[in-house]
Amino acid sequence: MDQKTLEKFQNALSNHRDILLQWLNEDSASKDIPFGGKSVNEVDHILSDLKNALTRIDEGTFGNCEMCGGEIEKERLELDYTTHVCLDHYTSEQIRALETDLELARRVQKQLLPCCLPELPNIEIAVHAASARIVGGDYYDFFTSKDGHQGFVIADVMGKGLPASLLMSNLQASLRLLGPEYETPKQILARLDELFRNNLKLIRFISIFIGIIDTKNKILNYSNAGHHPPILWNNTKKKIRMLFPTEPAIGLTKDPDFQSKTIQMASGDILLLYTDGLIESRNSYGEEFGESRLVEFTIKHSNKDVTEFLDELRLTAEKHTREFQDDLSLMIIKIR
């Protein structure tokens, strides 16, 4: 396993451990409510598994099969960091159970994505979603805010397989319920954080970008909770602006102070939203697609309509990476 991948596992496991320890150290009254549906004893068991996995990283044995010493599939480690053996040593019953979970995850993910795009004055929208071999937690959707403006969201649930897909379904249901109840992204994020705080401590976290556009006045109001920064092309100034996170991802901090920002947009402006499946994809030399390549692409193709822009971006990404290891989700919004 390469060093960068190992560091990602180590950081994720450490964050997971720290959140559990924080909960265990809280006063006893707060533990009367099961933690993500788990009792204190169950959380202790999960914490022990996390510590063992981190120990294996320190010892240099994480990801190695205990039976043959070979490398365990990275995708399976993302599904379950406690995995000790490679697929070659799974029983036929274990393999069938794994395949059933993965197929169900694919079905859940497919059914969650919107069947059609909003038709709006002054706005063009195009989207693309492709699942990797091991289904992850990418999600995008649209909603109408309380004051009648167009809302949109792109998110990534950290994790793989059925747990990520099921959490994604909860996220969809919550957003479709909360979106019409509030006027700003920060209000929606605050409620989402309240709803997901306990469950997320066992699924790690959700990075999410929520935007609401006043299509008549071309005003964008947004909040970015730990998601990769969308790229905004300012057609008037011919400049790029990165919409960096306004707060951490949901589930990483206790009682975050969510913020919203407002941008006046104009005709020809483009907003590109994406998940890490794009920028972290690697070519045969191990080079990531990266944000800088994405910025260069946006500048070069800013004169295209959203469909042409999306098609060209997909082709460019596929030339760079033959097989994506993570889900790939893209959303392009252009002001007419």
Label each region the model flagged.
Residues 72, 93:
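Cys/His-rich microdomains that often coordinate metals
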Residues 66-68, 88:
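Short, cysteine/histidine-rich loop/knuckle motifs that typically chelate Zn2+
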Residues 79-92:
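Cysteine-rich micro-motifs
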